[in-house]
Amino acid sequence: MSTAHRIFVFGTLQQGHRNFHINRGRRVGGDWATAQPHPLYVIGPMRLPWLLNRPGQGLQVIGQLYEVDDAVLADMDRLERLDDPLWYERRRIAVRPHPGPADAPAEQVWVYFGSEAGFADQTVHAGPIDQYSLSMAAVHPLRMP
């Protein structure tokens, strides 16, 4: 029997974005936001969304919350290259429904933080920002018009 995992997505795994086909989970409600500010950047030649694990810096990041099973979480982990120290790491983060009251109970869920090593020496195209939009994704050099 597979376990249900809740994961906050803020980049290419969001509905409408280029890696959404990997995200075969069930969306939970509308938008969600990090309970604490975190810096989100668009970096490098691929213009990747890069959320750093620096609570208290940046802005509250807006994204989507999904419930996924073990197989989908494993597919997401492969996409995000958890075995490579220059890519992402999966950690817990507190999120709340957005918009919503600041004192609403926060939920602890999974998120992919970009590694500090992967951030170093990259060109920063935008950030800190509160949301990775479709218009930001549209300028990805591998995206076809």
Language-model regions: role of each:
Residues 2-145:
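Glycine-aromatic micro-motifs
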